[in-house]
């Protein structure tokens, strides 16, 4: 295992489309009482979601200790597992609120895998001093997943815990683990933030983060992560990927001659 090295530069992309079009997320003007508002389109028949459907797997169950999360289906069928109980949602059901510390995960409703799911997702502002699920978290989590799964590599648990902790999100241990939320919280902080920070795992990467200054502000608040708050890193990364893109274009031109 080793800290990830981004292979793509997607900072500033809006909408952000990942996994061969399996999901597309656009930033919307947020209401005054919300941390963010995203318009998402999930296509369960494509990319990573098609692989999950084929194997019967789901995205990781998780919880947020300091934020309410909200889902509203605009088109299609969405399932939200709430503490292990699947709740099927359609456009007729209105907005669904998921309280803090609720173990949950969303996915296209089984039996409707070929349908596109259009939905809104938002969350309340974080509590003072707490990490938050926000745009920076989603950009890095999706960026990391795409780099890993599109190349058939194994996911690094420390990297996931580092990103989740910085995004106010924690993996849910199995249902039979006593005090599972507290266990998940401790694992995220100790392994993701503390140990991960010492081993070189940053929670945010300039290649994927649109508001890099905001990410640096967040990392500077942690002794274990402040060394990753390099405000000039994004410009260097942009120039690096521009050079690589130019070299790729030249190589293609020479090959076609």
UniProtKB/Swiss-Prot annotation:
For molecular function, the Gene Ontology terms on record are: oxidoreductase activity
E.C. number: 1.-.-.-
Question: Which EC class is this protein assigned?
Answer: oxidoreductase
According to its UniProt entry, the protein is used in biotechnology as follows: Yanuthone D is an antibiotic against C.albicans, methicillin-resistant S.aureus (MRSA), and vancomycin-resistant Enterococcus.
Q: Which UniProt keywords apply?
A: Oxidoreductase
Q: In which pathway does it act?
A: Secondary metabolite biosynthesis; terpenoid biosynthesis
Residue ranges spanning the membrane: these are none
| Null mutant phenotype | Loses the ability to produce yanuthone D. Also leads to the loss of production of yanuthone X1 which does not have 6-methylsalicylic acid (6-MSA) as a precursor.
Gene Ontology biological process: terpenoid biosynthetic process
Function, as annotated, reads:
Part of the gene cluster that mediates the biosynthesis of yanuthone D, a fungal isoprenoid epoxycyclohexenone that acts as an antibiotic against fungi and bacteria. The first step of the pathway is the synthesis of 6-methylsalicylic acid (6-MSA) by the polyketide synthase yanA. 6-MSA is then converted to m-cresol by the decarboxylase yanB. The cytochrome P450 monooxygenase yanC then catalyzes the oxidation of m-cresol to toluquinol.
Q: Which family does it belong to?
A: Belongs to the oxidoreductase OpS7 family.
The protein here is known as Probable oxidoreductase yanE
> What is the scientific name of the source organism?
Aspergillus niger (strain ATCC 1015 / CBS 113.46 / FGSC A1144 / LSHB Ac4 / NCTC 3858a / NRRL 328 / USDA 3528.7)
């Amino acid at each position: 295992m080793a800290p990830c090295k981004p292979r793509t530069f997607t900072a500033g992309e809006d909408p952000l489309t990942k996994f061969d079009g399996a999901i597309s997320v656009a930033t919307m003007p947020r209401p005054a009482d919300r941390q963010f508002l995203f318009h998402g389109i999930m296509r369960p028949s494509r990319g990573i979601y098609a692989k999950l459907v084929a194997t019967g797997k789901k995205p990781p169950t998780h919880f947020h200790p300091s934020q309410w999360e909200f889902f509203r289906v605009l088109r299609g069928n969405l399932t939200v597992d709430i503490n292990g109980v699947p709740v099927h949602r359609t456009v007729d059901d209105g907005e669904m609120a998921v309280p803090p510390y609720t173990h949950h995960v969303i996915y296209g409703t089984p039996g409707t895998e070929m349908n596109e799911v259009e939905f809104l997702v938002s969350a309340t502002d974080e509590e003072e001093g707490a990490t938050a699920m926000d745009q920076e978290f989603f950009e890095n989590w999706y960026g990391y997943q795409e780099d890993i799964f599109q190349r058939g590599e194994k996911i690094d648990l420390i990297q996931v815990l580092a990103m989740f902790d910085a995004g106010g999100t924690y993996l849910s241990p199995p249902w039979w683990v006593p005090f599972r939320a507290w266990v998940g919280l401790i694992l995220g902080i100790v392994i993701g933030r503390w140990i991960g920070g010492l081993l070189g795992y940053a929670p945010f990467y300039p290649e994927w983060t649109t508001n890099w200054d905001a990410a640096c502000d967040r990392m500077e608040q942690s002794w274990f992560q402040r060394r990753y708050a390099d405000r000039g890193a994004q410009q260097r990364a942009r120039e690096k990927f521009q050079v690589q893109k130019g070299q790729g274009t030249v190589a293609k031109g020479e090959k076609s001659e």
